[in-house]
A protein has these predicted regions:
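Alpha-helical protein-protein interaction modules
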Residues: 1-160
Length: 160
């Protein structure tokens, strides 16, 4: 995440203003997980899910916490919940692609990034900035998706 102190400071402000804000909870879970405070991240996200049970971001975040905690079966259950829900409700592709990126499934990550582009999701334009996707930026498949979308040069300033 870079400057952890600054990230925590800003995240605490966001959560103080809106304790159930899904992106603030997601970022807080990343901070806690990076600090190996898995139980705290789990508790935070379970409360977030109880407060907003329809929130797919908290489900994804909890699955990633479980994965990084070594609780693979629980992580896979969270992923299955998201995939099941995606059959009868709209779950943004960035949520699923970030989950796959965090658990190291490169093929599925690329598949869902392509799906985001096909769906013309706005989050496609900013996904490359997420810390879990940084390792994909030099991937041939990743570069091809953004070049085919006609936005590679604008997003990456020809740094490749």
């Amino acid at each position: 995440l870079g400057n952890m102190h600054l990230a925590e400071k800003h995240n605490n402000i966001a959560l103080s203003l809106s304790p159930s804000f899904q992106w603030a909870l997601h970022l807080r879970s990343i901070i806690l997980t990076d600090q190996h405070k898995f139980k705290a991240a789990e508790d935070l996200l379970i409360q977030g899910i109880m407060d907003d049970p329809d929130n797919p971001v908290s489900l994804m975040s909890l699955g990633v916490v479980y994965w990084k905690w070594g609780r693979k079966e629980q992580a896979q259950n969270q992923l299955l919940k998201l995939l099941h829900r995606s059959h009868f409700e709209y779950i943004k592709g960035d949520i699923i692609s970030r989950f796959y990126a965090a658990i190291g499934d490169n093929e599925k990550t690329i598949q869902w990034i392509k799906e985001m582009n096909n769906r013309k999701e706005m989050s496609f334009l900013i996904l490359h900035n997420h810390p879990w996707l940084k390792s994909f930026q030099k991937s041939e498949d990743f570069i091809k998706i953004y070049k085919n979308a006609g936005i590679f040069e604008e997003l990456f300033n020809s740094n490749f």
